[in-house]
Amino acid sequence: MAQKICTQITEFILVELMDRQDLKMPLFAAFLSIYIFTAIGNLGLILIIRTDTRLSTPMYFFLSNLAFVDFCYTSVITPKMLGNFLYQQNVISFNACAAQLGSFLTFMTAECLLLASTAYDSYSFLVALFHATLTFCLCYCHFNIINHFYCDDMPLLRLTCSDTHAKQLWVFACAGIMFLSSLLIVFISYVFIISAILRMRSAEGRCKAFSTCGSHMLAVTIFYGTLVFMYLQPSSHHSLDTDKMASVFYTVTIPMLSPLICSLRNKEVKEALKKAVSRSSQASVFVKLQK
């Protein structure tokens, strides 16, 4: 059997989200608007929770951490994706690709654990670091075009000429354990939540509680659903073009929706937001009067 020649790859070329040139600028404007909205929503939520003493509870501490993780992991992907719409050749260095994959996996793992109300930060960091190290210790051959808009595992594995069996087993084992354990915690939590809601005597209270829980379950379903669709299916069934579209949901859409779904439907957060806006308006009026 002929031995495959392993060459030193110093950079990769990222494939655009869509090949149509006429959609480049509309997509750039759309994703830039989403990213700005995501940054304002998540960072604003953190600021409101940190400055309002009424929100100094474990639940809002959890929400502020979730908002921080949402902002971080979309910031790992979106700025580079926006740049790809503007440049003719979307080049990313080998080290930058490794850093992007490692950072993204770290924040994505933290997101899964936070959604299950778990905070194993050191565990998520070590798993993501080992995961990325396994990927970039593989031997990459002549081709360096990644069929994705960011550095992701499955497209990178298509480029390697090494045996990926051990790596794929690691991906399925880690993803399976993490997803299933997180989903089990979420499921058990909702069994108790629904049981408590059904014991409520007020019909209005039940409707309000189901509305809040339904919003959270929508976010959980979209997030876990896209991850399961992408990472827990056999490689023979993988379509990278379909994966690219699915990954937009959890890299761009979910971080934008999280502050709306998890917080702005909450009465206490709404009141804190109104109070912050009122203070800001009063401060601006005072500054104008001083002038």
Task: Please place each PLM-identified region on the residue numbering.
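Transmembrane helical core of 7TM receptor-like proteins
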Residues: M1-K291
